[in-house]
Amino acid sequence: MADLDQQFLLSQIARRGPWNDCANLPTVVQAASEQTRIGLVLADAAFDSERNHTYIRRELGAQSVIPAKRGKKTWRIHGVRAQMRREFSRRVHRRRARIESLFSSVKRKLSARAPGRSLRAQKRQALLLGLSFNLYRLRHRCLFSRMSTGPDGF
């Protein structure tokens, strides 16, 4: 989970992939909501489930913008998912592309792999990558805020 405006990671889970992360969305969102108020959750179609929409909207009081999965024609979409399909905002969901930019930045600046031998070490290294990226962003944000373009900034 990330703050797209500040480009910070708010919460993360590390596990061996490939894995279906749909069931983990409430856990990750809950961990992030303990750090800051969550007003909007953007996710891709892999996270589309009635359970996820209901959790985000009822438990957190946030808006969820998750495109509906394309399934069999016999699937009946009802409840919050049906409402999401009717009222889906492509303009708002376009902001989700920023998370891909953030992931790319983590991989470029730090690393794309956790080379530990054991699964436990790999998980720990993956979580430390997220922490390191946040520290990197804090440092560079402070440097940019101290820079001045005015003539008296020297």
Question: At which residue positions do the language-model features occur?
Answer:
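A generic membrane alpha-helix/interface feature
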Residues: D21, Y55, A62, G79, ...
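Basic, amphipathic alpha-helical segments enriched in Lys/Arg and hydrophobic/aromatic residues
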Residues: R85-F154
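Helix-centered, glycine/charged polyanion-binding patches within enzymatic domains
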Residues: A45-P115
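Juxtamembrane/interface motifs at transmembrane-helix termini
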Residues: A31-A32, W75, Q125-A126
